């Protein structure tokens, strides 16, 4: 509901910090699709903070990997995949692995 309220005011920028952390998997998948649909319709910039790599690859156009030093960006990964995305697509899996490897090796 909070996501719907946030988009209702048609923001230029929306910051979402772990918005799906306490949701079950089925609801999370549904809301990820809704977020992408709203983002495309409203053309707002969304900064989506998550520790879930699969979630990041699913919703993002680009992923910023932060280093262990505060406010330092270690890497940027472009996610140039068509929508709707499939978590079993080989390109999706490759990007997920790339992000995971960047996180693993600070």
Put a short name on every predicted segment:
Residues 14-17:
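Catalytic Walker B motif of ABC-type/P-loop ATPase nucleotide-binding domains
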Residues 58-65:
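Conserved catalytic segment of ABC-fold P-loop ATPases
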